[in-house]
Structures are given as C-alpha cells and as structure tokens.
Swiss-Prot record:
This is 3-deoxy-manno-octulosonate cytidylyltransferase. Pfam families: CTP_transf_3. Belongs to the KdsB family. It comes from the Bacteria. Its main location: cytoplasm. One of its GO terms (biological process) is lipopolysaccharide biosynthetic process. Its EC number is 2.7.7.38. Activates KDO (a required 8-carbon sugar) for incorporation into bacterial lipopolysaccharide in Gram-negative bacteria.
Length: 253
C-alpha cells in the first residue's frame, strides 16, 4: 500500500519563532520529523514550507536523504490548506493517500504514521486519525486535551475540548476517578487527496469555530473520520521552549 507524507513547516510560530529550524543535536527539528516519516515506509515525503530559510536549510540533504521540499503560500490559515496546495502542485490522483504529519513532532513513532495510512486504506471514510487512552483524571478536564468518541465501528461521533462522554453517575460522586472510556485525539491525519480540496472549499462550520477544532468541519458536512487507538503513544510535541528542552533531553538519552 503506497502513501505520501506531507509535513507542513510554518516558520512564523507565535510561541517559538523559527520552530522548524530549532536545533536538536545538530539537526533542524523538521529534519528529525522527516527521518521518522521516511522510516514509516512512505513512498514520498514532502516538507511544505512558507519560508525560504526552511527550504535552504533542507536543500543540502533533501536529495540525498530522499525527500522533497515544496514552497507554499504564506497566506494559508491552516495546515490543511497548505496540504491542499501541495496536492494541487504535484497533481496527486484523487485516491492517493496523504498523511499529514506535524512539523513539530520530532519524536513521532514511524509505526503510527504507517498505521493511520493503512487504516484509511481499509476504511469507508475519506479521512482517518488516531487516539490514545486517557488514564489521568486531570487530562479528562483539560481543554487542551482533545477528546474523541466513536461509534462501534470506530468512526468519530464527535471531537471536543469538553469532557466527553460525561460520566454522570461517577462524576456526581467524584471527579478524581475516571472510567476506561476516554480517548485523547492525536493530531495526525490521513486523507484521500481528492477529499482535501473538497474540505478546504467548504465554509468553516459553527462547531469548529466554537471548539477551535478544524476536524469538526468534516463531521458537520456529513463525512466520516475513522479513529483507531494508536499502536504507540507519541511523546511530547514542541510548542514552547520548555517542550524543545524536553525533547533535546530525551534524544540525548
């Protein structure tokens, strides 16, 4: 089964400017992500950036390492819009499976990149993603941890920053203990290329704007998202300097 990995790498991060090029043991962060994507067995790996500094930093190793760099518009409002531009640029067939791997996930396990691609290939949905079990009560009530609930076949019913499902009887007694039915969404997606353009052509939905979760647009317009439990939980991504320091320490060991 063939698939393409696209890694959006936007330079102008608010909390960590120049994030794609942050040095992690002699390599820019985005290069670590590329290496994980190559290890997943992807047919092609493409870094989609809006800044020539990222392109120049990767140019020397791209050809030899076996990945590509695609310059994209600075005007995109989301990584999915950048992904759509890449699909148009390369003229991917509508049934091409494209996996969107965030450029700030230098420790992402290659096995889950492959997993989400395989899951989409086997699913009756235009989009697939992953989740991990929540075992900490604090995380259930943390709005930064996005929860997902699915039907019996693994298709998403809803994503929310709220505590879903609400365990009425348990929480009436205490919120310190949780059941085993909570799943945290992981921000890795596989799409069929033809669907990506449909997605960006849709107007943003009320729900996605309220929750600030763009995947809700897919459910709003009546399409399915397949969700499976990740074979391996990804370690911390990089949003802040503290996250970057943590990743450096983990890789040093």
């Amino acid at each position: 089964m063939s698939f393409v990995v696209v890694i959006p790498a936007r330079y102008a991060s608010t909390r960590l400017p120049g994030k794609p090029l942050a040095d992690i043991h002699g390599k820019p962060m985005v290069q670590h992500v590329v290496e994980k994507a190559l290890q997943s067995g992807a047919d092609r790996v493409i870094v989609a950036t809006d800044d020539e500094r990222v392109q120049q930093a990767l140019a020397a190793c791209a050809g030899q390492a076996g990945f590509e760099v695609c310059m994209t518009s600075k005007d995109h409002q989301s990584g999915t819009e950048r992904l759509a531009e890449v699909c148009r640029h390369y003229g991917f067939a509508a049934d091409t499976i494209v996996v969107n791997v965030q450029g700030d996930e230098p420790l992402i396990p290659p096995v889950i990149i492959r997993q989400v691609a395989d899951n989409l290939a086997a699913a009756t949905a235009p989009m697939a993603t992953l989740s991990v079990p929540i075992q900490d009560a604090e995380e259930v009530f943390n709005p930064n941890a996005v929860k997902v609930v699915t039907d019996q076949e693994g298709y998403a019913l809803y994503f929310s920053r709220a505590s879903i499902p609400w365990d009425r009887d348990r929480f009436a007694a205490s919120r310190e203990q949780i059941g085993d039915h909570y799943q945290r969404h992981i921000g890795i997606y596989a799409y069929r290329a033809g669907f990506i353009q449909r997605y960006v052509d849709w107007a943003p939905s009320a729900l996605e704007q309220i929750e600030a979760l763009e995947q809700l647009r897919v459910l709003w317009y009546g399409e399915k998202i397949h969700v499976a439990q990740a074979l391996e939980a990804p370690p911390v991504g990089v949003d802040t300097q503290a996250d970057l320091d943590k990743v450096r320490a983990l890789l040093a060991n």
